[in-house]
Amino acid sequence: MKEDFLHYLWKYKKVPLNTVLTTGERLQILSFGEYNSLSGPDFQSAQLLIGEQQWAGNVEMHLKSSHWYVHGHESDPAYRNVILHVVWEHDIEVFDANNQPIPTLELQGLISPELLERYNTTVTSHYQFIPCEKEYTTVPAITLLSWNERLLVERLEEKATAVNELWKAANFDWEKVLFCMLLKSFGGTVNGEAFLQLGKHLDFSIIRKERSHPLHLEALLLGQAGLLPEETELTYPRELLRNYYYLQQKYKLSAPVVKIHFTGLRPQGFPTIRLSQLAQLYELNEGLFSQILEVNDFKSIQKLFAVGVSEFWETHYTFTKTSKKVKKSISASLITLIWINVFIPLKYAYYQSLGKDVSESLIEELKTMTAESNSIITQYQQLGVSVATAFDTQVLLQQYKHYCQSKRCLDCAIGISILGRK
């Protein structure tokens, strides 16, 4: 058992309103108070009747009475106004700073066996994927509807926090933020962080100045990534190298120390190809940030990302080996991921900075997008969970990462719904 189960019992009023303390005194709960998620006692502003005396103050909870001393509450001023100590097992008398006994309520024996059985079955039992996997699909649709929207807003807020940190680091330049986020997406799982560091390290004003020179832009990105060959007999790589040396001198560039990987990637996802595509994206689109604020459907975004690679990369994946000529456009799946992981959180953070809440319109936007495909989503589908759009997948990913993995069932509407059944 975990302490959060005691919080659940108190918060959702699963404790008898009329009972007795460990001393045998009569206890009547007039108000359970408000849950406190910050430091200090677990519940504040509770109202109790102990014997004939009415009390108002805080309630603290532990699995055992002795944990009061384990946590050092006896010397903490924040706990001086505790009027009730709620425990699962009363194993020791507890005294306040004035050496007065603190009224204690032992819950063991007061909770219905059915509720305990549901708790043990759902939260503490062995499972393969998530704790509620056997009962997930039995949760009422109305519960899921409100919970899913809350999860999505949580996810938007979480991503907006990261965007805002990037915005501050970029001296409040939204174009630079977009550039960094696009680099991370183009880098994918393998090179995302390395590409992000490239973006952070590079002065975006150079991209603005050089975007009308395709060779310069590609040389800049490949050179900063450390991907240009030191020696080559091929004409195009030599041109890139020459242009990069020129840009190095012109802008006094220093390349960040990052490790770019090819291993484990399909050729279409090689960093050389991705950086060439990104260079072409910026060559063909001036003021890209203002454009992404306007697009909200896949067709428009696909048109924006209708770019390829420079001629050399049509017959190469690396600088050393020629390959069959293949059109290397940005795939629909990558465009969808960029829409979900770049455009949506960036729009949310941008409009939030202007004091506007666009969460509802972004939720509707996500509901028009194709569902993502990954191992976590597949496992939810195997439970019988319906996954139709990116809204569904984003909700499930947020739930899995922040609730299921850490077994926060008692903070989850699904877990509470299952536990609360009669």
Where would I find each of the regions flagged by the language model?
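Low-complexity, highly charged intrinsically disordered N-terminal segments
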Residues: K2-H7
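A broadly used, surface-exposed interaction patch
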Residues: D42, A46-E93, N98
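Structured loops at beta-to-helix junctions and adjacent beta-edge loops in soluble globular domains
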Residues: H62, V87, Q108-L110, S185, ...
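Short loop/turn segments at secondary-structure transitions that flank enzyme active sites
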Residues: S65-H67, H90-I92, I111-P113, G188, ...
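Compact, glycine/acidic-enriched structural inserts
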Residues: V82, V86-L144
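Cysteine-cluster motifs in flexible loop/terminal segments that predominantly coordinate metals
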Residues: Q394-K422
